[in-house]
């Protein structure tokens, strides 16, 4: 373990890797990251699988074994195999943490982002296909995704809610989670091992808001560059604390073994070279959060990260930052609505590339 990753973990942050591939699984890389960099979970998304499945070689034996199946089936076989194997690698981590950590996420088809029933159906299919208690099914926090989140949790299935950008949507996600856990309880499920994370995207907010601030050009605008994303996320943590402390249903569910849905900081790689490469880790350290990060960010954290608590005591300042943005005419809801739409579109584009690459692989290995 490095001092910085250990300090980050000791401060309450679970470090997850935002990456997965067949070569990473087979090389022993995950075991090394568990042993040496405090990594206790993995997230995937269509863009990650696009990168992984573009590799010629690691997936060929399974493609040959599958034969000339349709491409949708092949993609699901390849991706669920990777996730199943990764969950096995993280099983000991899961058991030692009472299934708080050791989780590996797999996302529903992004083309279903605005289809509630189809999302719910595929979430159940993926859960059964991976067939591991430390898996998590990723469902986007679109308006249509919210009831699917509740319905999936009600079946006792662990859910990672993805593509959350706004406080308004995050509050709806928490409500969907608590309702889902209440239904799971009513359905007789053991609540102890139902896990959930709320993937709140960070750096993309700065990328979008900074462009608006640069266009404004004033000294007041310049002083706010690089501040919107962290302020937004810190206020999400304030919302997390308040909602679970004050929801009248939660105390009874927690007494039955339910665990709070964890804030999960996503999109934490720094996209602006002027900012610290640990910015979206070091500035969002607090108890019971997850930070899922690309390996480049993980290596930066391990090398020179801080890891000290950094959210407590920042709420007043964070509210002030958001108010100043509004005073400059920046409508954060417009920004986050566009980021959600763009996020869904980007994942669909990646998924289309995955399908094309896997079809090419099927054709190549089967002549």
For the regions a protein language model found, what residue spans apply to each?
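N- or domain-start disorder-to-order transition segments that initiate the globular core
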Residues: 1-30
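Structural preference for beta-strand elements that scaffold enzyme active sites
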Residues: 12-16, 40-43, 101-105, 134-138, ...
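Active-site beta-loop-alpha junctions enriched in small/polar residues
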Residues: 18-22, 47, 107-113, 140-144, ...
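Active-site-adjacent beta->alpha loops and helix N-cap segments on the catalytic face
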Residues: 24, 115-121, 139-153, 166-178
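Conserved, mostly hydrophobic/aromatic
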Residues: 45, 106, 137, 152, ...
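Active-site beta->alpha loop and helix N-cap motifs at the rims of alpha/beta catalytic domains
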Residues: 48-148
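Catalytic alpha/beta core domains of metabolic enzymes, predominantly
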Residues: 158-296
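Flexible, acidic glycine-rich loops studded with aromatic residues
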Residues: 258-363
